[in-house]
């Protein structure tokens, strides 16, 4: 279903909303109206009966961070709102926890008069009668912001242990029955920093523009952000809770011991679980503060500091063992004692992790049964870490069918060769291409099949489909559906594989044995042209080819290489196809279409070609869109984590709607952010988010070299998925975007993201420590240097007024004998070139790499 048809359908569905939900109960009490309140920064409404937050808009503005327009279909018991509370308690000495939930069986709360509050209520009517905890909730003005506090008093004659204490959150992330334009205009997205006393939520408009919102602990309370707990609600068609159009809501947990010992007992939590003892008659107050971020998304970190919440800023939170990172702690001077957690993930050196991926995928994941009736041998198959075997059957046939994002783990191995070629791995990839990819996945043509595994037993006599699998779902395609060539996303996987082998063979002659580099380059071109072809009326011949593709930056790399090789006819053909799409996007209000109602995948391609053709307005719109769903926080899992929550359904072993940590959205969306940063080197927010996105997916490579689809974020799991799943496109982003960035950061000073930096007098020396080690950007000069093979061992330049860079290039593990050095100046009007001895070639300068390396100088022209 294409984006524009979907818009029309959703608009029609919206008009039918009242008919769909006519049977829903008004347990919330909307019939009795609202209480309208305001502070210096907010206009807000409370539901009169429940005194939960119904609407929250910046003062004098119309943008509502809450789904007030959907409140009439969110009135049932167990539908959560800001102002609800959940907790578990037990008498000291007891073992069983008693769960309490203010949304479970709603009753009108009792109004409490409080001079220090905008509104206050006793929640006892809506809590179980036998609860020993009396809860008073207050809505208060906190320096113009909105505060929400709960005071719990132990009314029992014995001590009570509070084992969990949670604040459900509700913001307007409901996409159901909205058009793309409405989603952008009305919706917002929530991301957590689970950092204990320094924890906070950031709520950002989907458009990425306008004011944002942060939620922080209230001053003078002990309200740590200990855990982020997904909430279950009843399902109604009107909102479709926990679906592709409505991820669902979460709660901020102050304490989590009760969960840690029960539902979460198999998981390792982000923070040590705690509880709180209330003696008989004792009270405790906890609370949250809702603050407007008037400077928008880029002002979030500054706004957090303004609430007296400690803040940390670092050069990344995924740390290879050979990399030194920086962390700055920004806290109020009068702070007494707080506990903050900064979450790091320590890996082997990035190239070592990449090498393990290549070794594992071409051994343990290598499938050689040539009797396979589907023609899948030899190939690199999807992998299940729980069984330690390739996935040869799955009802989602593409996972076992070497196509779709969930079945193309071979693309990760291929992309690895583009930077770190290995003779044995390339030999197996060439065998795969000649025996499976070209003759079967492509059927010897330029088209690409949706899957080469299928469920149609009559066509494969003698093959035994597993009887333990349910083959009755839509995704168990028959042969005709599997062999369809009508999914454009599948073409990019094939293009990337051909391109990667071209680059490996082009830069290191002798690596390719079965085909020439020219053959691989030609195959990449032909597959690209087939993917984006149109009829005489301009209509797509392959479905979805008009929208942005996952990983299509590789098409841009292909185009550059065609120009460098002098293949002008082929380059012109690719460019014409891309220009048509870019012009279309430039005419659309929301050009980020996909197979889904809302997605975070089209932005990469939309940005690439809008930026390429200098369609600045659309490129800027795209960057804003990405920042709307991609945060930077001091947590390896959430820093640079692009919002995705449905692909465990399509490519995971554990299938559920769940926020995914470092799925392919992270690395692919990092590409536009880092590209834009190179053009605007003073906008370091882009670098912080983008670097988090490109480094995060390194955590998906296990120590044995196997890979996982994404990390499960629900607190009852917190592990990587067993399936390799969609990691192929994810690793493509890692290979295309990894680089070292040297920047004078306003908060950190002169630092290197992805490298080790040292200053000796006026000389700065940087040693790259990223996954590729072939790209470095120096923001003070605005120069971006890329080498085609080998490694950049180190570079040096003057601390002030630098006019040249000296690089030390080495052969690297692939033992490269020569390299092309390409020099770009995206962040400067100054032109740079290689001034040391070199030969002009392929749009750059070729240098010979001796065994000990070679020194190359890049200076202003």
What are these regions (language model features)?
Residues 333-365, 371:
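Extended acidic/polar, glycine-enriched regions
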Residues 297-325, 333-334, 344, 572, ...:
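Terminal, non-catalytic domain-edge segments
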Residues 122-176:
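Acidic, contiguous internal or C-terminal segments within carbohydrate-active enzymes
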Residues 24-127, 136, 177, 181-255:
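Acidic-aromatic substrate-binding/catalytic surfaces of carbohydrate-active enzymes
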Residues 13-25:
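N-terminal signal peptide
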Residues 364-674:
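Catalytic cores of extracellular degradative/oxidative enzymes
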């Amino acid at each position: 279903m294409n984006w524009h048809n979907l818009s029309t359908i959703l608009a029609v569905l919206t008009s039918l909303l009242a008919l769909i939900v006519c049977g829903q109960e008004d347990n919330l009490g909307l019939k009795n109206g609202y209480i309208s309140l305001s502070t210096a920064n907010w206009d807000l409404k409370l539901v009169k009966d429940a005194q939960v937050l119904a609407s929250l808009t910046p003062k004098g503005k119309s943008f509502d961070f809450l789904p007030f327009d959907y409140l009439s279909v969110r009135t049932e018991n167990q539908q959560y709102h800001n102002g609800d509370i959940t907790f578990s308690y037990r008498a000291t000495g007891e073992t069983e926890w008693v769960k309490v939930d203010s949304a479970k069986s709603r009753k009108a709360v009792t109004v409490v008069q409080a001079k220090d509050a905008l509104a206050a209520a006793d929640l006892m009517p809506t809590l179980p009668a036998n609860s020993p905890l009396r809860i008073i909730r207050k809505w208060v003005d906190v320096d113009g912001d909105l505060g929400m506090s709960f005071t719990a008093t132990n009314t029992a004659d014995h001590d009570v242990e509070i084992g969990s204490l949670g604040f459900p959150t509700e913001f307007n992330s409901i996409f159901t029955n909205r058009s793309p334009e409405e989603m952008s205009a009305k919706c917002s997205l929530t991301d957590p920093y689970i950092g204990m006393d320094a924890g906070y939520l950031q709520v950002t408009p989907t458009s990425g523009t306008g004011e944002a919102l942060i939620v922080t602990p209230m001053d003078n309370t002990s309200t740590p952000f200990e855990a982020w707990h997904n909430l279950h609600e009843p399902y109604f068609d009107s909102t479709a809770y926990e679906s592709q159009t409505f991820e669902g809501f979460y709660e901020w947990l102050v304490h989590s011991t009760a969960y840690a010992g029960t539902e979460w007992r198999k998981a390792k939590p982000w923070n040590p679980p705690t509880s709180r003892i209330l003696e008989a008659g004792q009270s405790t107050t906890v609370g949250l503060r809702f603050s407007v971020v008037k400077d928008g998304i880029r002002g979030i970190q500054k706004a957090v500091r303004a609430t007296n919440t400690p803040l940390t800023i670092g050069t990344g939170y995924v740390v290879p063992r050979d990399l030194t990172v920086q962390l700055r702690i920004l806290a109020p001077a009068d702070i007494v004692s707080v506990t903050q957690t900064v979450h790091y993930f320590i890996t082997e050196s990035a190239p070592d992790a990449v090498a393990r991926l290549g070794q594992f995928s071409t051994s343990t994941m290598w499938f050689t049964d040539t009797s396979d009736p589907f023609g899948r041998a030899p190939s690199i198959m999807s992998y299940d870490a729980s069984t330690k075997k390739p996935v040869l059957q799955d009802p989602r046939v593409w996972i076992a069918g070497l196509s779709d994002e969930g079945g193309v783990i071979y693309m990760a191995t291929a992309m690895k060769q583009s930077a770190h070629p290995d003779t044995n791995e390339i030999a197996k990839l060439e065998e795969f291409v000649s025996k499976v990819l070209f003759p079967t996945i492509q059927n010897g043509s330029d088209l690409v099949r949706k899957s080469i595994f299928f469920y149609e037993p009559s066509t494969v006599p003698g093959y035994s489909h597993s009887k333990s699998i349910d083959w009755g779902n839509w995704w168990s395609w028959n042969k005709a559906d599997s062999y369809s060539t009508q999914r454009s996303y599948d073409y990019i996987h094939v293009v990337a594989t051909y391109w990667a082998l071209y680059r490996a063979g082009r830069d290191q002659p002798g690596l390719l044995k079965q085909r020439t580099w020219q053959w691989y380059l030609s195959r990449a071109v032909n597959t690209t042209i087939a993917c984006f072809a149109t009829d005489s009326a301009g209509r797509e011949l392959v479905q979805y080819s008009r929208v942005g593709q996952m990983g299509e930056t590789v098409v841009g790399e292909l185009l550059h290489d065609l120009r460098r090789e002098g293949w002008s006819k082929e380059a012109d053909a690719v460019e014409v196809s891309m220009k048509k799409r870019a012009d279309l996007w430039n005419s659309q209000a929301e050009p980020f279409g996909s197979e889904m109602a809302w997605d975070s995948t089209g932005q990469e391609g939309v940005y690439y070609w809008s930026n390429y053709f200098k369609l600045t307005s659309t490129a800027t719109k795209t960057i804003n869109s990405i920042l709307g769903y991609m945060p930077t926080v001091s947590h390896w899992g959430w820093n640079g984590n692009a919002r995705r929550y449905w692909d465990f359904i399509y490519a995971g072993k554990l299938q559920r709607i769940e926020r995914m940590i470092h799925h392919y959205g992270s690395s692919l969306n990092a590409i536009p952010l880092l590209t834009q940063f190179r053009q605007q080197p003073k906008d370091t927010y882009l670098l912080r988010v983008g670097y988090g996105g490109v480094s995060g997916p390194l955590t998906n490579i296990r120590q044995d070299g196997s890979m996982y689809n994404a990390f499960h974020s629900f607190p009852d799991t917190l592990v990587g998925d067993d399936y390799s799943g969609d990691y192929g496109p994810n690793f493509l982003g890692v290979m295309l975007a990894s680089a070292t960035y040297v920047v004078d950061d306003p908060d950190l000073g002169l630092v290197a993201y992805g490298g080790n930096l040292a200053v000796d007098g006026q000389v700065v020396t940087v040693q790259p420590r990223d996954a590729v080690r072939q790209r470095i950007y120096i923001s003070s000069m605005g120069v971006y240097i890329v080498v085609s093979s080998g490694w950049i061992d180190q570079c040096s330049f003057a601390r002030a007024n630098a006019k040249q860079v000296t690089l030390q290039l080495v052969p690297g593990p692939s033992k490269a004998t020569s390299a092309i050095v390409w020099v770009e100046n995206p962040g400067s009007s100054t032109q740079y070139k290689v001034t040391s001895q070199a030969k002009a070639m392929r749009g750059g300068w070729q240098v010979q790499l001796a065994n000990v390396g070679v020194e190359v100088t890049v200076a202003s022209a």
